């Protein structure tokens, strides 16, 4: 399961890349989404690689992301009471584990498909270079967890 974070804004962006970012629900800087690892999504990531960063999210980081930044329609926080009433799970943590293991989805559980994060503490490395070159863009594998923790 990939976590994707939008790093760069919308000024000067080509229309096909903007459309791809819209399909990924990444409309603003510091928004994050979680998607399964499928060939169609990998193609979308390659197309938008100059505006986003992504990597494999760990289960612990995903649980923290859902409990701290997960929202319901109306910008309400996700609570254990809501999860007990509206899903088959007992707590937010159990729901996060089920979503991580692809037993259910964010949409099926009633959560919004994106997470609005803060800019990272100590800032981005460089928003115009790839992660390999010492920047913030592109694929970063397990390092995405450190960035997410700085942004939650």
Swiss-Prot record:
GO terms for cellular component: cytosolic large ribosomal subunit. Part of the 50S ribosomal subunit. It comes from Methanosphaera stadtmanae (strain ATCC 43021 / DSM 3091 / JCM 11832 / MCB-3). HAMAP family: Ribosomal_uL30_A. SUPFAM superfamilies: Ribosomal protein L30p/L7e. Keywords: Ribonucleoprotein, Ribosomal protein. Belongs to the universal ribosomal protein uL30 family. The lineage of its organism: Archaea, Methanobacteriati, Methanobacteriota, Methanomada group, Methanobacteria. This is Large ribosomal subunit protein uL30.
């Amino acid at each position: 399961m990939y976590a994707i974070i939008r790093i760069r804004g919308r000024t000067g962006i080509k229309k096909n890349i903007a459309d791809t970012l819209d399909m990924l629900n990444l409309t603003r800087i510091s928004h994050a989404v979680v998607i399964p690892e499928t060939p169609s999504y990998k193609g979308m990531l390659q197309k938008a690689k100059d505006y986003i960063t992504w990597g494999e999210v760990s289960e612990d980081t995903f649980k923290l992301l859902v409990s701290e930044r997960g929202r319901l329609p109306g910008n309400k926080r996700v609570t254990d009471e809501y999860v007990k009433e509206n899903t088959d799970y007992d707590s937010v943590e159990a729901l996060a584990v089920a979503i991580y293991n692809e037993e259910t989805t964010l949409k099926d559980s009633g959560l919004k498909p994106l997470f609005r994060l803060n800019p990272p503490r100590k800032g981005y490395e460089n928003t115009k270079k790839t992660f390999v070159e010492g920047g913030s863009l592109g694929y970063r594998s397990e390092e995405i967890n450190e960035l997410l923790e700085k942004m939650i």
